Regions:
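Short capping/connector residues at structural and topological boundaries
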Residues: 81, 85, 134, 144-146
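Tryptophan-rich aromatic "cage" segments
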Residues: 144-163
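Non-catalytic, well-ordered alpha-helical segments in soluble enzyme domains
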Residues: 101-124
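Generic hydrophobic, helix-prone segments enriched in Leu/Val/Ile
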Residues: 1-2, 101, 158-163
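A structural signal for short secondary-structure junctions
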Residues: 71, 106, 131-133
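Short, charged low-complexity intrinsically disordered segments located at boundaries
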Residues: 41, 69-74, 138-150
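Polar, surface-exposed loop/tail segments
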Residues: 57-59, 119-144
Length: 163
């Protein structure tokens, strides 16, 4: 469907009704990044290669980063469990003394180690993580980790409609 920029702007404003004029671009970029991740997972599943999808939702807990919300790449310190090393060169957005941070860092890094070791990411303390399929299952990493089916449905359907 062809749309003028004016009509697309109206649709975006209606969809992101909670966004301020200054933050709508951030929401659009976040959604587009998520859409690409979902598209890659979908294509991998369709081609038989398979894959897993996760979303990192744990908001930063340091005073200077609390206002960011869960940002792109903030999970990297969890991936490499950088919280145990006070001299880490990693950018850290979370309080290394927080028990939730410590626990998630151990479980997430352990999950990735298990995946590299065996080809299966399960067994390191997180919920049973299914391969991406028609249910669009996604591991949500947060204070409490869980599996959600199609957690970005509203956004996915909107971006499919406007493309």
């Amino acid at each position: 469907m062809d749309r003028s920029l004016g009509s697309l702007k109206i649709e975006l404003r209606e969809f992101y009704f909670e966004a301020s004029e200054g933050s709508i671009h951030e929401m659009i970029w976040t959604d587009m990044f998520r859409k690409i991740c979902m598209d890659v997972a979908q294509l991998s599943a369709l081609q038989g290669a398979g894959g897993w999808l996760y979303r990192f939702d744990l908001a930063p807990s340091l005073p200077e980063t609390k206002h960011f919300g869960a940002t792109h790449s903030s999970e990297m310190a969890f991936t490499f469990n950088a919280f145990g090393n006070p001299d880490t060169p990693s950018r850290i957005f979370h309080d290394r003394r927080d028990p939730v941070v410590k626990d998630l860092a151990l479980k997430w890094s352990g999950t990735l180690i298990e995946f590299v070791r065996s080809g299966d990411p399960n067994g390191a303390g997180l919920p049973e993580w299914r391969m991406y399929d028609d249910s669009r299952s996604c591991l949500i990493l947060d204070e409490y980790c869980y599996i959600a089916d199609d957690p970005d449905k509203r956004h996915r359907e909107f971006w499919t409609a406007v493309n």
